[in-house]
Curated annotation (Swiss-Prot):
This is tRNA dimethylallyltransferase. Belongs to the IPP transferase family. It comes from Chlamydia abortus (strain DSM 27085 / S26/3) (Chlamydophila abortus). InterPro entries: Dimethylallyltransferase, IPT, P-loop_NTPase. Monomer. GO terms for biological process: tRNA modification. It comes from the Bacteria. Keywords: ATP-binding, Magnesium, Nucleotide-binding, Transferase, tRNA processing. Its cofactor is Mg(2+). Catalyzes the transfer of a dimethylallyl group onto the adenine at position 37 in tRNAs that read codons beginning with uridine, leading to the formation of N6-(dimethylallyl)adenosine (i(6)A). ATP binds at G39, P40, T41, G42, S43, G44, K45, T46. The record marks T130, R152 as: Interaction with substrate tRNA. The keyword Nucleotide-binding applies. Substrate binds at T41, G42, S43, G44, K45, T46.
């Protein structure tokens, strides 16, 4: 990712198309602009989006794998009902906690939301930190059978007990041709390959799926990645986790347990929920409260590192350092780029 410049003469990689390829530039005039706003947990994405939307007549699509669930409010830092009344939001509170929701579901619903917003001459703003959902939106839905959460849980336990290298060796025995195309450290692809073999009875290399192109290729996508200093983000996360607990996160977890969150292995493993589910299962011992709180904070910090690493792989997300900038200023910079190049 690279930090952009904000002035009338600035040329981003997208803007340079005007100079390099007139035909491509002409075709792009007919593309509708979609804003992608990403960043690590605690970077201020929500505040920026709420200020950006009125500036460009936009509506917001959540790119958060847990905000789709009703009742998972405090632990996901879900935007308030008042703000959702003021600015339309999509893909929030659309599922019961026992329902499964995956990247394929996200893709089709996000595309539908974009079409809805654009049909009214407004601007879709996709906001969130779930990297794989952004990847799916940009690249098209994953091919193959839907995920099997129970099978994935078994593989996760296997990795915990025996290590990822042994699981990779297992894949090498079952599908050596595919195994040679990935690294022994690529946990996601190893798990997905074994899952496909388990569900279809065929090797991954035997399948001849045709990749479905993403409909977002019809859009002029302009992406941003909010990048606060790491030290400042750690402090923000500490305060954020503390505030969630003061806002009765543990009571929220109790309510979700009664609603059956355990039946959803994805939701029950979400950071901010899995730690306190374990705490409750242990009988909520007072002496372990501080240790669990620290684990909650540490897990969140580790997740932000993964988010930074993930988005660095996608040059469409231009890094926007946020040190010393207010949410209003950041939103104004993104709006300026939209009016210059959108």
């Amino acid at each position: 990712m690279r930090a952009p410049e904000f002035h009338a003469n600035a040329m981003t990689s997208t803007g340079c198309d005007v100079c390099l390829d007139p035909q491509k530039s002409f075709a792009k005039l007919f593309k509708r602009t979609v804003i992608l706003l990403a960043g690590p947990t605690g970077s201020g994405k929500t505040d920026v989006s709420l200020r950006l939307a009125p500036m460009i007549d936009g509506e917001i699509i959540s790119v958060d794998s847990m905000q789709v669930y009703r009742g998972m409010d405090i632990g996901t830092a879900k935007v308030s009902w008042e703000d959702r009344q003021r600015i339309p939001h999509y893909l929030i509170d659309i599922c019961h906690v026992q329902e499964l929701f995956n990247a394929v579901d996200f893709y089709y619903q996000a595309i539908q939301a974009c079409q809805n917003i654009l049909s009214r001459n407004k601007v879709p703003i996709l906001v969130g930190g779930t990297g794989f959902y952004f990847h799916t939106f940009l690249s098209g839905p994953p091919q193959g059978p839907s995920p099997d959460c129970d099978f994935r849980d078994k593989l996760a336990l296997y990795i915990q007990e025996h290590g990822l290298s042994l699981l990779y060796e297992n894949l090498c025995l079952k599908d050596p041709e595919y195994a040679r195309t990935i690294t022994k450290n690529d946990r996601n692809k190893i798990v997905r390959a074994l899952e496909i073999i388990h569900l279809t009875g065929k090797k991954v290399s035997d399948h001849k799926w045709t990749k479905e192109a993403s409909e977002c290729q019809e859009y002029n996508c302009r992406g941003w990645f909010l990048s606060p200093p790491k030290e400042l983000l750690r402090d923000t996360i500490h305060l954020r986790c503390q505030r969630m607990l003061e806002d009765d996160l543990i009571d929220e977890v109790h309510r979700l347990l009664k609603q059956g969150i355990r039946d959803n292995s994805s939701a029950s493993r979400a950071i901010g929920y899995r730690e306190w589910i374990e705490f409750i299962d242990q009988g909520s011992p007072a002496e372990s409260y501080e240790a669990v709180k620290q684990k909650f904070i540490t897990n969140t910090c580790h997740y932000t590192k993964k988010q930074r690493t993930w988005f660095k792989r996608y040059p469409i997300f231009r890094e926007l350092p946020t040190l010393g900038l207010t949410a209003e200023t950041i939103a104004a910079k993104i709006a300026e780029d939209y009016f210059l190049h959108g």
